[in-house]
Design a protein with these regions (language model features):
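Ankyrin-repeat boundary/"N-cap" motif
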Residues: 1-6, 22-29, 51-63, 86-101, ...
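Leucine-rich solenoid repeat scaffolds
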Residues: 4, 8-13, 128-155
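Repeat-mediated protein-protein interaction surfaces in helical alpha-solenoids
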Residues: 6-18, 35-44
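Conserved ankyrin/ankyrin-like repeat signature
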Residues: 15, 38, 71-72, 107-111, ...
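Conserved hydrophobic site in ankyrin repeats
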Residues: 18-20, 42, 76, 115, ...
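Ankyrin-repeat inter-repeat connecting loop/turn
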Residues: 49-50, 83-85, 122, 155
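Tandem repeat domain/solenoid detector
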Residues: 78, 82, 117-121, 150
Length: 155
């Protein structure tokens, strides 16, 4: 894992931005930082990067979704990122699970809505059969819960 991604995972956005300065970001770093300009460059050069796998088992859409980058998620979906692809690790997280785990409620809702409209499964199950509705309930996000139910999630 790169130093940039490690800093992002630790929640140290300032350090991640410092480390990213002057560096040619890869698709995972660009997605996790929400750098849509860099994402566009990378996807223009190689469209398959929209569904590439990081060493930790995540794809760019999952990273953009988890870190609350609506524009990056929209770009990736528009470029063919798979909305129902589970991570290749023990968690089996899909982008909708990642969106449901975003800290900011408005970003969480916006990304979940984007993914659902693109065909994300509202009943997707990750590790231990955890669903997006369970994530909404856990965070007390009734607005997200209603959105999921409107798109066919089981209550």
């Amino acid at each position: 894992m790169s130093d940039v991604l490690a800093a992002i995972y630790r929640g140290d956005r300032e350090e991640a931005a410092r480390l990213a300065g002057g560096k040619e970001l890869d698709v995972f770093e660009a997605a996790a930082l929400g750098r849509t300009g860099r994402l566009e460059e990378l996807l223009d050069a190689d469209a398959s990067l929209a569904n590439a796998w990081a060493d930790d088992g995540f794809q760019p859409l999952g990273l953009a979704s988890f870190f609350g980058h609506v524009d990056a998620a929209r770009l990736l979906v528009g470029r063919g990122a798979e909305v129902n692809s589970a991570s290749r690790n023990a968690m089996k997280v899909m982008p909708l699970h990642s969106a449901a785990a975003t800290r900011d409620a408005d970003l969480r809702y916006a990304i979940a809505e984007l993914l659902l409209e693109a065909g994300a499964d509202p009943n997707a199950r990750q590790q231990d059969d955890f669903t997006p509705v369970m994530a909404a309930d856990q965070s007390g996000d009734t607005r997200l819960r209603e959105l999921l139910l409107e798109h066919g999630a089981s209550g």
